[in-house]
């Protein structure tokens, strides 16, 4: 039996690691969830994701409720108060229980002398809630995005930035990809129905299913057997443009965690696939995904800027470059991105993308296809990146995705329930 732990203090410490130390919630949360009971896993996740989704609001409220911020060794208390405010604002947890558990969290983080302070701040919020929220809703902080990102979205999408921001602040739907080598989408949907769950097919992507209500993967028919994979619909769209064929040599570059590698092999089971990523941890997940789906690919660790180090002079029929990016299209799925990214990251990422594109182009056969993809919504990483590449690369031709003046296809967050995603299909003359 797992030891009873204070979830509020665990959430506060995790959020502090994200905001103060720049760590990814995707790395921090799973080990923490192993320490709590199954019924508490979901609540711990809700508290972490929820606070990070609404961080700017909670920060704004604390600044109104407290004379000065908590600093130094007491900084965790700042995040514990955030967890308390989030529960009062956004959950169905009875207020008395939310307060009691949050105040008790001070003991778990070895700050019992601050229980009274935490209790006082949260009770003050309860008394002034209507007045504070009215003031908050009249401020720019209501968009729940850092100002640098808000400015970039407003500049890039003067007519659509508000709908993008709104979509980013929602909980994402759960999308699945049916493994066509095992089942047709319709036959798997019938199995889902028999299991008492509902799913809906995507209009454009032939393997995509949206669950009516998100569910744990172990509850999905045939998940362990590889019949289905969790993958957003927009990410599945890459295969529409890549169109892999049996017998081809295909490179999946920046392949971790392996969702697109396995999708290539579902569409073209006899393709020769090389999956490459610079990150060892992400590569381990590529191996895990291949194993679960019973598939084989060559997997290598390598830097996309120096392909000769990991593939020599090899040429490929098709290349999928899922480029490292700001991930500004998947904020609803990873709300910590809002607080991990900085404005200065964008030109640095654009430079890295440019270097990888130039380096890998020489490894594409004449007549071959390269699909450039990102989960960003920022033009510097997307349309402007491809426009510049086309201008400096004489043998590159845009195909099916946009125009030379406005290259690529940009999906915005929430459009057709998918994540924000960009694709450009390039042919080598």
Swiss-Prot record:
Catalytic residues of the enzyme:
375
Pfam families cross-referenced by the UniProt entry:
Methyltr_RsmB-F, NusB, RsmF-B_ferredox
Classification via SUPFAM superfamilies: NusB-like, S-adenosyl-L-methionine-dependent methyltransferases
Name a single GO biological process: regulation of DNA-templated transcription
Presence of keyword S-adenosyl-L-methionine: yes
Q: Name one GO molecular function term.
A: RNA binding
EC nos:
2.1.1.176
**Which reaction(s) does its UniProt entry say it catalyses?**
cytidine(967) in 16S rRNA + S-adenosyl-L-methionine = 5-methylcytidine(967) in 16S rRNA + S-adenosyl-L-homocysteine + H(+)
- Binding of S-adenosyl-L-methionine occurs at 254-260, 277, 303, 322
**Where is the protein localized?**
Cytoplasm
Q: Mind telling me which NCBIfam families this protein's record contains?
A: PRK10901.1, PRK14902.1, rsmB
The entry's function note states: Specifically methylates the cytosine at position 967 (m5C967) of 16S rRNA.
The protein depicted here goes by the name: Ribosomal RNA small subunit methyltransferase B
Q: What organism is listed for this UniProt entry? A: Escherichia coli O6:K15:H31 (strain 536 / UPEC)
Q: Where is the organism placed in the taxonomic lineage, from the top?
A: Bacteria, Pseudomonadati, Pseudomonadota, Gammaproteobacteria, Enterobacterales
Point out the gene that encodes the protein: rsmB
């Amino acid at each position: 039996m797992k030891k009873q732990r204070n979830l509020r203090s665990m959430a506060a410490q995790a959020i502090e690691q994200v905001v103060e130390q720049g760590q990814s919630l995707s790395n921090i949360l799973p080990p923490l969830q192993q320490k709590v009971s199954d019924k508490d896993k979901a609540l711990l996740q809700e508290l972490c994701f929820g606070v990070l989704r609404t961080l700017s609001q909670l920060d704004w409220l604390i600044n109104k409720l407290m004379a000065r911020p908590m600093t130094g060794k007491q900084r965790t208390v700042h995040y514990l108060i955030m967890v308390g405010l989030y529960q009062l604002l956004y959950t169905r947890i009875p207020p008395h229980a939310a307060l009691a558990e949050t105040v008790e969290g001070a003991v778990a983080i070895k700050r019992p002398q601050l229980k009274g302070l935490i209790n006082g701040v949260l009770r003050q919020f309860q008394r002034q809630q209507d007045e504070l929220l009215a003031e908050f809703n009249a401020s720019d902080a209501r968009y729940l995005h850092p100002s640098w990102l808000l400015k970039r979205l407003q500049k890039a999408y003067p007519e659509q930035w508000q709908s993008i921001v709104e979509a980013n602040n929602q909980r994402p739907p759960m999308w699945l990809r049916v493994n066509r080598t095992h089942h047709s989408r319709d036959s798997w949907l019938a199995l889902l129905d028999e299991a008492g769950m509902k799913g809906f097919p995507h209009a454009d992507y032939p393997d995509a299913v949206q669950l009516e209500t998100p569910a744990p993967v172990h509850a999905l028919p045939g998940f362990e057997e590889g019949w289905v994979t969790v993958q957003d619909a927009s990410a599945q769209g890459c295969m529409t443009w890549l169109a892999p064929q049996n017998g081809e040599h295909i490179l999946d570059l920046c392949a971790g965690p392996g969702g697109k590698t396995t999708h290539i092999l579902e569409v073209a089971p006899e393709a020769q696939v090389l999956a490459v990523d610079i990150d060892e941890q992400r590569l381990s997940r590529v191996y895990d995904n291949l194993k679960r789906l019973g598939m084989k690919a060559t997997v290598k660790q390598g830097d996309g800027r120096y392909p000769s180090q990991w593939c020599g002079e090899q040429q490929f029929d098709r290349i999928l470059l899922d480029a490292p990016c700001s991930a500004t299209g998947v904020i609803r799925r990873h709300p910590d991105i809002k607080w991990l990214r900085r404005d200065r990251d964008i030109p640095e990422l654009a430079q890295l993308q440019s270097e990888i594109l130039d380096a890998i182009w020489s490894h594409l056969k004449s007549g071959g296809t390269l699909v450039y993809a990102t989960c960003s919504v920022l033009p510097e990483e997307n349309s402007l990146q491809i426009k510049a590449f086309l201008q400096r690369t004489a043998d590159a031709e845009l195909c099916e995705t946009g125009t030379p003046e406005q290259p690529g296809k940009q999906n915005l967050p929430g459009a057709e329930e998918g994540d924000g995603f960009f694709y450009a299909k390039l042919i080598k003359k």
